[in-house]
């Protein structure tokens, strides 16, 4: 009985020994999903997740700067507070928690650059991508506004958690740091959500949010000295809107152009090089 | 029916029918078939990109930390200004975790010539693949550090370029010993994480493999940063030495190849011959339950 060949599989042209199937490209406009509650639930989840992300992280930044302010906390304040390492942990750890919580609901993007990368890879529809980005941006603004609402004096005094290119670094350096940082993040997201890897891991994706959180943490360690680390346009937008300072606004373009370019490069690298989905390579037999 | 199957498979496959894993056969030194597969070149590209990202993130973290703790640049109270040496150790360990996770299914996630060398000694990769990986890792490291220098060249030169060299107060023997033991810890963890017997015991779900490898790197950095800045990865040391290009890193550079390769060899021997009882199998004088 077991020896019988599954003719339908052979006729479909699929490789029979593979126990995973790459999902078909998402349509640009999916009329069906517009009528489903799951789309709106996902959008709400992205909004709330991004709101929480910005509230926790910006509150951490403001608290750190207050505790290390010599004029507010005494002359030996420099070593108080959670430190830059603690800020990096806040960003990375919060992404881990929130991706874990929302992965099954919205895919756990929490970042317009991630949504853009997945859209380029045809894993989300255009409508869904736009709704997610809008929800993320609004959530970010609300999250930072909560921080300002609760500690407005400190918020304005300590830079509002806004992303700006630091003194001593050029605009080009900031842009490059954002591009590479977002590449690391989106590349990790692609690896974590790859159906082939899920099949190899016996379809147990339990660890997927952890490397994504660690990727955010790592990029923050490397990039905080340069730009305060954006790699998330919603995060940068939220702080710029609520802080509303000319320096933050004049550098804002870096935090959209850089992440979107980095996400696009990551999408190309993963889809074309690693998954070899461009079947134009006639000279190699692909085992993707 | 059930008993016949057991007896038959037992007779045909030798003893211990209860094992639900098989050790893969030793990789051939030269595998002509794999040279024609895209998967080999994809793996080499993945190793290059992974090592490039590893060096970019980690060296940028080192330079950023030194800049933020530089009193002449960031004020008199700068000593606690950066991510700290702990943050640097996290950057190395965390980045290895992320990158091993991303490339494990593509290239095995080595990102380190010492790991490749250890796995080659254990016959888990072919000679050609090992050499290609090592070249890709070294080139990726050079490009990664090159990116850091391109983006912040003044700070890169001023703050030592993230290069590995022996710290003052430590002898070369101490540095070499630290690199040997540090790499032993890392490669031994890699062997344990990729052991087919352990995968069988864990129901063939290798999801956690990259995490202890990343933590091993993190732990070794905590211990060895004061001694040598921690190499335990010849590509990492080479990348920084090439781009920074000063006498001191080059004088000490041999430590960062001899130490890691010796440590990897010891780890390969320990895991394959003692823990997996490869020698006992060969001798046949003990009944092995490997």
UniProtKB/Swiss-Prot annotation, chain A:
Q: Where is this motif: NPA 1?
A: 111-113
Task: Locate the motif NPA 2.
Answer: 232-234
> What is the designated name of this protein?
Aquaporin PIP2-6
What is the annotated localization of this protein? Cell membrane
Domain text: Aquaporins contain two tandem repeats each containing three membrane-spanning domains and a pore-forming loop with the signature motif Asn-Pro-Ala (NPA).
Q: Which keywords does this chain's UniProt record carry? A: Cell membrane, Membrane, Repeat, Transmembrane, Transmembrane helix, Transport
Role summary: Aquaporins facilitate the transport of water and small neutral solutes across cell membranes.
Mind telling me which PANTHER family this protein's record contains? AQUAPORIN OR AQUAGLYCEROPORIN RELATED
Which Pfam families would you find in this protein's record?
MIP
A GO CC annotation recorded here is: membrane
Entry keyword DNA damage: no
As for membrane topology, the entry says: Multi-pass membrane protein
Q: Which InterPro entries does the protein's record reference?
A: Aquaporin-like (IPR023271), Aquaporin_transptr (IPR034294), MIP (IPR000425), MIP_CS (IPR022357)
Bilayer-spanning residue ranges: 42-62, 81-101, 130-150, 172-192, 206-226, 254-274
Q: Which family does it belong to?
A: Belongs to the MIP/aquaporin (TC 1.A.8) family. PIP (TC 1.A.8.11) subfamily.
List the molecular function annotations (GO) for this entry. water channel activity
Swiss-Prot record, chain B:
Motif interval(s): NPA 2: 233-235
Keyword match Cell membrane: yes
TM segments?
Answer: 43-63, 80-100, 131-151, 173-193, 205-225, 255-275
Which molecular function term from Gene Ontology is one that the record holds? water channel activity
Motif (NPA 1) spans which residues?
A: 112-114
Record-linked Gene3D superfamilies: Glycerol uptake facilitator protein
The stated induction of this gene product is: Expressed in roots with a circadian rhythm showing an increase at the end of the night period, a peak during the first part of the light period and then a decrease.
Q: What Pfam family is a match, any one? A: MIP
Q: In which tissues is it expressed?
A: Expressed in roots.
What GO terms in the biological process aspect are recorded for it?
A: protein heterotetramerization; protein homotetramerization
What InterPro entries does this protein map onto?
A: Aquaporin-like (IPR023271), Aquaporin_transptr (IPR034294), MIP (IPR000425), MIP_CS (IPR022357)
Where is it located?
Cell membrane
Q: Which GO terms describe its cellular component?
A: membrane; plasma membrane; protein-containing complex
About its domains, the entry says: Aquaporins contain two tandem repeats each containing three membrane-spanning domains and a pore-forming loop with the signature motif Asn-Pro-Ala (NPA).
Which function does this protein serve?
Answer: Water channel required to facilitate the transport of water across cell membrane. Active as homomers. Increased activity when heteromerization with PIP1-2.
- Family note: Belongs to the MIP/aquaporin (TC 1.A.8) family. PIP (TC 1.A.8.11) subfamily.
Subunit description: Homomers. Can interact with PIP1-2 to form heteromers.
Q: What is this protein called?
A: Aquaporin PIP2-1
Its lineage opens with:
Eukaryota, Viridiplantae, Streptophyta, Embryophyta, Tracheophyta
């Amino acid at each position: 009985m077991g020896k019988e060949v599954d003719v339908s599989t052979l006729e479909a042209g699929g490789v029979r020994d593979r126990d995973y199937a790459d999902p078909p490209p998402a349509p640009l406009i999916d009329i069906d999903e517009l009528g489903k509650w799951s789309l709106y639930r996902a959008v709400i989840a992205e909004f709330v997740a991004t709101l929480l992300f910005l509230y926790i992280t910006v509150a951490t930044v403001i608290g750190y700067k207050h505790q290390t302010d010599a004029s507010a906390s005494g002359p030996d304040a420099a070593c108080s507070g959670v430190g830059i390492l603690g800020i990096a942990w806040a960003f990375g750890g919060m992404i881990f928690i929130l991706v874990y919580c929302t992965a099954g609901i919205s895919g756990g993007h929490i970042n317009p650059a991630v949504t853009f990368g997945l859209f380029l890879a045809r894993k989300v529809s255009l409508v869904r991508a736009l709704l997610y980005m809008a929800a993320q941006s609004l959530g970010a603004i609300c999250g930072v506004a909560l921080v300002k609402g609760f500690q407005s004096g400190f918020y304005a005094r300590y830079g509002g958690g806004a992303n700006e290119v630091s003194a001593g670094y050029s605009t080009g350096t900031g842009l490059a740091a954002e591009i590479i940082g977002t590449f690391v993040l989106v590349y990790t997201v692609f690896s974590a959500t790859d159906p082939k890897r899920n099949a190899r891991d016996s379809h147990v994706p339990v660890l997927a949010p952890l490397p994504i959180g660690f990727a955010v943490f790592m990029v923050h360690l490397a990039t905080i000295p340069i730009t305060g680390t954006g790699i998330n346009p919603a995060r940068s937008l939220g702080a710029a809107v609520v802080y509303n300072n000319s320096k933050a606004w004049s550098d804002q373009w870096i935090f959209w152009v850089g992440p979107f370019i980095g996400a696009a490069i990551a999408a190309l690298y993963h889809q074309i090089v690693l998954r070899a989905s461009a079947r134009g390579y006639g000279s190699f037999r692909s085992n993707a």
